[in-house]
UniProtKB/Swiss-Prot annotation:
Gene label: ASMT
A molecular function GO annotation: protein dimerization activity
Name of the protein: Acetylserotonin O-methyltransferase
Pfam family, one: Methyltransf_2
A Gene Ontology biological process term: melatonin biosynthetic process
Organism: Gallus gallus (Chicken)
EC number, UniProt record: 2.1.1.4
Gene3D superfamilies with a match to the protein in the record: Vaccinia Virus protein VP39, Winged helix-like DNA-binding domain superfamily/Winged helix DNA-binding domain
Oligomeric form and interacting partners: Homodimer.
Length: 346
């Protein structure tokens, strides 16, 4: 970053300052249905047609489409009768609602929830606490009461998490051979995408999603196919209620929500419940040991500040938490993607 070129003209600083504009362009195009319309049409469409079908102004849509072209989310063909737009392949795969790898729901969660919390990042840094109260006018003392403040918000969050596991789930579940573990509890399993991937990869296992009652109800009714008999549900709060015996406990993006004290409390209960020879699989975005990256994880850790009571950690920090609970033979696997895997054995 400190090259002579950067010092003469701070291009990278300008890129950083425009970062939130880039995000909002993508979020807005998703929300308005630009990518879905172009996928469904099966052919490039003109500005006038896109604006008319999506009920927007021509002037506003033109600028949005051109920005998407600049970001390589759309491609444009200049014809005699004007500009015609189509999706790029990456948009077809990840930004349309109907794609199996769609990230639409997490985009909407970021746009409507995360984006608003980050407006108060300065306050979060000053105070060292999340910003639900400022962003939404609701108490943040009950973290998941705030996060699941309405059924619509809860569904948005759960569907968003499911979308992440549609592209990252296989990597974290195959980082280790989990076939010896036949009875698995997915603590805080939410919308069930990771559980579904687990029973697909390991057909001899059963997975029980352990989550709050209202989460379980939504997952049962709207997110997990009823014909999938290898997935069961357990309603409860794992900080207050008992954890049943099992061979393996999956905690995916759970510990990063909490401070070290709460993590030690939860892992101690998991260790008590775990069968001898069993284990716990942590799925988290790992910081490098010198905390110099990855930048995505550093940003996620700030997001934990504005939204939760937790933080992202290094592999050593997670290993120490597991060791304090009694787990041994801790192994770490970096996937090269957003989320990594840490396995501890009893």
């Amino acid at each position: 970053m400190d090259s002579t070129e950067d010092l003469d003209y701070p291009q990278i600083i300008f890129q950083y300052s425009n970062g939130f504009l880039v995000s909002k362009v993508m979020f807005t195009a998703c929300e308005l249905g630009v990518f879905d319309l172009l996928l469904q049409s099966g052919r490039p469409l003109s500005l006038d047609v896109i604006a008319a079908r999506l009920g927007t102004s021509i002037m506003g849509m033109e600028r949005l489409l051109d920005a998407c072209v600049g970001l390589k989310l759309l491609a444009v063909e200049l014809r005699r009768e004007g500009a015609f737009y189509r999706n790029t392949e990456i948009s077809n795969i990840y930004l349309t609602k109907s794609s199996p790898k769609s990230q639409y729901h997490i985009m909407m969660y970021y746009s409507n929830t995360v984006y608003l919390c980050w407006h108060y990042l300065t306050d979060a840094v000053r105070e060292g606490r999340n910003q639900y109260e400022r962003a939404f006018g609701i108490s943040s003392k009950d973290l998941f009461g705030a996060r699941y403040r309405s059924e619509e918000e809860m569904l948005k969050f759960l569907a968003g998490q499911n979308s992440i596991w549609s592209i990252c789930g296989r990597d974290v579940l195959t980082a280790f051979d989990l076939s010896p573990f036949t009875q698995i509890y997915d603590l805080g399993g939410g919308g069930g995408a990771l559980a579904q991937e687990c029973v697909f990869l390991y057909p001899n296992c059963t997975v029980t999603i352990y989550d709050l009652p209202k989460v379980v109800q939504v997952a049962k009714e709207r997110l997990v196919p009823p014909e999938e008999r290898r997935i069961a549900f357990h309603e409860g709060d794992f900080f207050k209620d008992s954890i049943p015996e099992a061979d393996l406990y999956i905690l995916s993006k759970i510990l990063h929500d909490w401070d070290d004290k709460k993590c030690r409390q939860l892992l101690a209960e998991v260790y008590k419940a775990c069968r001898p020879g069993g284990g716990v699989l942590l799925v988290e975005s790992l910081l490098s040991e010198d905390r110099s990256g990855p930048v995505e994880t550093q940003l996620y850790s700030l997001n934990m500040l504005v939204q939760t009571e937790g933080k992202e950690r290094t592999a050593v920090e997670y290993s120490e938490l597991l060791g304090a609970a009694g787990f041994r033979e801790v192994q770490v696997r970096r996937t090269g993607k957003l989320y990594d895997a840490v396995l501890g054995r009893k």
